């Protein structure tokens, strides 16, 4: 079943010598259902007069899904990374500064949430885990710095792109002309991607008719 997440209000710093501050996840429509296997963990910020400390990851949180590569990205406003689909690796995304509009589509044929679409704003102090087979894209609402951990080292053959404005995706972005990489700008339609995945033996949903 899908995981349902409510909006959380942004907690304010109390000004005390030692406080635990949490930020919000702004969810489109008030609540959001996440595809099966997608996880959102809220982090704790320990702050005092010296600064702050945040644990971003622990092996005990996901002992069977360890990140072997971490990548830092900085994005200008209106940058869209994706949509991408991975056959093998899982992503673990942390926003360090700014915020990202996240778009997800479950393309796994055997998933309990196949075809489910989700959209929400990811702010700091949360870790978003996305399993293989869930299409995802990240749009920078503001200048944004993010850290992405992956379960496998980067392999271009495992990074499949889709046109961001393909109506069959059902994902809506704040602008019709985002800043894209050349590879994302030349991406195929969802139908073409699904046909290629099926030909390669991957169990994905049927192409739209």
How does the language model describe each region?
Residues 121-142:
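Conserved metal-binding segment of the jelly-roll/cupin
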């Amino acid at each position: 079943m899908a995981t349902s997440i409510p909006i959380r209000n942004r907690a304010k710093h109390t000004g005390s010598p030692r406080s635990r501050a949490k930020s919000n996840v702004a969810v489109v429509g008030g609540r959001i259902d996440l595809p099966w296997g997608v996880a959102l963990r809220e982090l704790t910020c320990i702050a005092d007069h010296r600064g702050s400390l945040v644990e971003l990851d622990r092996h005990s949180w996901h002992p069977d899904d360890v990140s072997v590569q971490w990548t830092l990205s900085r994005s200008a406003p209106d940058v869209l990374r994706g949509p991408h689909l991975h056959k093998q690796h899982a992503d673990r995304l942390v926003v360090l500064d700014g915020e990202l509009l996240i778009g997800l589509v479950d393309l796994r044929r055997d998933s309990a949430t196949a075809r489910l679409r989700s959209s929400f704003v990811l702010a700091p102090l949360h870790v978003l885990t996305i399993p293989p087979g869930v299409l995802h894209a990240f749009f920078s609402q503001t200048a944004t710095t993010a850290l992405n951990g992956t379960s496998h080292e980067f392999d271009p053959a495992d990074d499949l792109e889709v046109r961001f404005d393909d109506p069959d995706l059902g994902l809506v972005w704040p602008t019709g002309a985002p800043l894209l990489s050349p590879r994302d700008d030349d991406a195929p339609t969802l139908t073409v991607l699904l046909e290629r995945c099926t030909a390669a033996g991957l169990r994905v949903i049927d192409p739209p008719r």
